[in-house]
Amino acid sequence: MGCSNCQPEIKTSLHSKDSNDFEDDVWGDDDVYVDANADVKRAHQKQGYLDGLASAQESSLQSGFDKAFSDGARMGAAVGKILGELRALGESESFYQATKELNIAKIMDKKYFDSELKIQKNHEVIYKWQKIVAQHLEDATKA
């Protein structure tokens, strides 16, 4: 793909001092040189910047995942316990309703997170169903 016998000149003059076209230049610029390696340097700098940015994002993402994973696992265990107890108690209507309300998309709604994206300590829907299960258990022990 590359050309054979291609060797870029390190510096190339855009115009010559001998050129009369630029003698009347208002700014009186000296020769302007273009570094043939400038594009390569710029590409390496850009890639280095992008690599650094990606690395920082990955570590930040991993940190966020590590913090949120335990909260998510705790919530998942609570939901599983609620559904398991309702199923074991034979409360099929409550079980059906709980599966709808405790759907992952619903319990992870943004309204249950604070401004720092931390889950509220007492998730209102999970707490509601824990109370319902407790009532069903109490009713079952009385019967």
Curated annotation (Swiss-Prot):
Q: Where is this region: Disordered?
A: 1-20
Q: Which InterPro entries match?
A: Essential_protein_Yae1_N, Yae1-like
Positions of the UniProt region annotated as deca-GX3 motif: 48-88
Q: What is its main location?
A: cytoplasm
Disulfide connectivity for this sequence is none
User: Is NADP a UniProt keyword of this protein?
Assistant: no
Q: How does it assemble?
A: May form a complex with LTO1.
* Job description of the protein: The complex LTO1:YAE1 may function as a target specific adapter that probably recruits apo-RPLI1 to the cytosolic iron-sulfur protein assembly (CIA) complex machinery. May be required for biogenesis of the large ribosomal subunit and initiation of translation.
By what name is this protein known? Protein YAE1
Alphabetized UniProt keyword annotations: Cytoplasm, Nucleus
Q: Which GO terms describe its cellular component?
A: cytosolic [4Fe-4S] assembly targeting complex; nucleus; Yae1-Lto1 complex
Asked if Acetylation is a keyword of the record, the answer is: no
Residues that span the membrane, as ranges: none
What gene is this protein a product of?
A: YAE1
A single Gene Ontology MF term assigned here is: protein-macromolecule adaptor activity
| Subcellular location(s) of the protein | Cytoplasm; Nucleus
Xref: Pfam families:
Yae1_N
